[in-house]
């Protein structure tokens, strides 16, 4: 399923090509690209729930303190290793993620059918969430820079 999400993001969203709006046509396109029907339906459902998060009239989180600390559940810790959880905290500290967008990312990660997620895959989920939440253009650009920019020169002497 994650491969399909990456395919859609790279080929349609990130490349700014208009996404096919007809789900049947999109399903046929993905089938021609070699993806299985069941995985396609899961990926489209995942994207639909992501869109629902942004379109909801209700705030994603209610009554949260700005200085609160996120405690991960056992299932969340199984899917997000220490490095990934640390990266989420880092993104909050540099204000790429807000408390709300962090929770949206965790929500979308937990809906993936992967047992665990490596950091590079988490970065793509974060990018997908930020792309779909209005008003996060600057955060999206910062996240793009974190993914695509390669450090220049030597890191260590």
Curated annotation (Swiss-Prot):
Q: In terms of domain of life, where is this protein from?
A: Bacteria
* HAMAP family named in the record: Smg
Query: Family assignment?
Result: Belongs to the Smg family.
Indicate what this protein is called per its UniProt record.
Protein Smg homolog
Species in which this protein is naturally found: Shewanella denitrificans (strain OS217 / ATCC BAA-1090 / DSM 15013)
């Amino acid at each position: 399923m994650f491969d399909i999400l990456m395919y859609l993001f790279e080929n349609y969203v990130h490349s700014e090509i208009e996404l096919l709006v007809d789900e049947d046509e999109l399903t046929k396109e993905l089938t021609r690209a070699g993806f299985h029907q069941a995985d396609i339906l899961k990926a489209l459902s995942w994207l639909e729930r992501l869109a629902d998060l942004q379109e909801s009239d209700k705030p994603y989180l209610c009554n949260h303190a700005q200085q609160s600390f996120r405690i991960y559940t056992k299932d969340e810790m199984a899917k997000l290793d220490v490095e990934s959880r640390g990266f989420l905290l880092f993104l909050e500290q540099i204000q790429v993620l807000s408390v709300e967008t962090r929770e949206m990312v965790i929500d979308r990660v937990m809906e993936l059918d992967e047992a665990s997620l490596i950091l590079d895959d988490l970065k793509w989920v974060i990018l997908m969430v930020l792309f779909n939440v209005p008003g996060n253009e600057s955060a999206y650009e910062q996240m793009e820079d974190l993914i695509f920019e390669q450090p220049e020169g030597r890191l260590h002497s």
